[in-house]
Amino acid sequence: MSSFQQENQLNANNNNNNVMNEYISYSVPLSPVTTNENPQDYWMNGLIANSVPISQTTSNSDINYSQPPNPINFNSIFEGVNIFSNDDFTSSSNDISLANSPETNATSDSIAQNLDEVKVKLENHNQARLDALEFAFETKSILKEQPKIKQEPGTKAATKPKRRAPRKKLTESQKKAHNKIEKRYRININAKIAGIQKIIPWVAFEKTAFETGEENETEAEAKNNTRLNKSMILEKATEYILHLQKKEEEYMAENQKLREQVIKLGGEI
């Protein structure tokens, strides 16, 4: 082998040693794992071993490492189940998972299409519920009735007073017919009052001051101007009725006395 080849091989070996030394200097030793160790303690011990600074010396011959500190027992911390069953822990983990989840690159067309589909489904669902309510309660007109605007008490429409229709003026023929009808009613009432007058003995032959429809009224009016009106006749009729009631009571008392006398004498009634 030539001297040039030996020199190249020596340089290659030196380079390999340098690479290995650099690799060993940047590597971090892990604590030994024992089979009897708890997995939670092993995880925490590894975390502490990686986080604690380690003094290292690199050389071509040997590597010296400082021993990690004694592992801390975390069994007492993790024995409680409430740490992992807390709602805040669950909600925070869900938020972190949502934040770390990859975003979907949805296009605007697909989003618009999805929104249209959701709107159509909501409309169909609402219509189905409305139809079900109408069928169950028979309130179709009530459900579809538009809300009416409520008027405030202060804004009530002023009610206009109703105007009476103007009276039509009667013609001459209508006036004559109306007067004849009223005269007939008046004469009928006067005749009834005149009949009461004839029942009363002390005014039966007196003349009346009102028209009764008799033929000799004009002749009697010329002979005697003093006449009885309707109020006077009604007053006399009331006095006469009271007089008759009093006489009836007297007759009843006298009749009772006569019956008692007949019974005393041994007669029969």
Curated annotation (Swiss-Prot):
Gene3D superfamilies recorded: Helix-loop-helix DNA-binding domain
GO MF, one annotated term: DNA-binding transcription factor activity
Disulphide bridges, residue numbers: none
Keywords per UniProt: Carbohydrate metabolism, Nucleus, Transcription, Transcription regulation, Virulence
Inducers of expression: Expression is controlled by RTG1 and is down-regulated during mating process, yeast-to-hyphal transition, and in presence of benomyl, amphotericin B, and caspofungin.
Entries under PROSITE patterns matching the protein: BHLH
The keyword Transcription belongs to this UniProt entry's keyword annotation: yes
Record PANTHER family: SERINE-RICH PROTEIN TYE7, TRANSCRIPTION FACTOR HMS1-RELATED
Name of the protein this chain belongs to: Carbohydrate metabolism regulator TYE7
Organism: Candida albicans (strain SC5314 / ATCC MYA-2876) (Yeast)
